[in-house]
Amino acid sequence: MAVPRANTSKARTRRRRAVNMRLEAPHLVECGNCGNFVQSHRVCGRCGFYRGRQVINPDDLC
C-alpha cells in the first residue's frame, strides 16, 4: 500500500524558492563624462549626460 508523502515545511519551501528568486546586482558602468557609476542605458544623475551629450540639467533634479 502507498505511503503518504510528508508535508514540506515552510522553511524548506522558502529556502528552495530563495535560491531561484535571488535578486542580481545591477550592472554598473562608468559615466564617460564625470566617472560616476550608473546603470547601462540610463542618464547619469550627477552630470545629466547620456551617450556623450547633456540631456538634462543636473540642477533641475533636486
Swiss-Prot record:
SUPFAM superfamilies assigned: Zn-binding ribosomal proteins
Pfam families the UniProt entry points to: Ribosomal_L32p
UniProt keyword Ribonucleoprotein present: yes
What is the name of this protein?
A: Large ribosomal subunit protein bL32
Q: Which family does it belong to?
A: Belongs to the bacterial ribosomal protein bL32 family.
GO CC annotations, alphabetized: large ribosomal subunit
Q: Show the InterPro entries listed in the entry.
A: Ribosomal_bL32, Ribosomal_bL32_bact, Ribosomal_zn-bd
Recorded GO MF terms: structural constituent of ribosome
The reply to whether Ribonucleoprotein figures as a keyword in the UniProt entry is yes
Q: Name one GO biological process term.
A: translation
Question: What keywords were assigned to this record?
Answer: Ribonucleoprotein, Ribosomal protein
